[in-house]
Amino acid sequence: MIDTFTVAGHLCVDLAPELPAELELTPGALQNIGPMRMVVGGSVANTGKVLHSLGANVKANAVVGKDELGTITKKLLSDVGISVESIIETSETTSSYSVVVEPKGIDRTFWHHVGAN
């Protein structure tokens, strides 16, 4: 049986603010929104989380920026039981993230920065 799975590919942090149904995108307007949810995403995280939930040891193989978001990305992976020892940090670009725009009652959209992927 396989002892450890290595998952490789796209890795990002999803930033999902809680949005009201009546959200308006009026230029210059201040909108009151709810708390921010931060979840590690992309194929590395999503596949890794499922494998770990099935009892497998999982090692992530991806690249993040040598920045605060890269540190957060690695912490979020570690928090769900995925090894981050093979993740490469680079100063040549920034870490990947998506802003998940999901007002109540409306299908979500993603505003994405590819970053180190």
Locate the predicted segments by residue:
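Conserved N-terminal subdomain of the carbohydrate kinase-like
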Residues: A29-Q31, M38, S53-N117
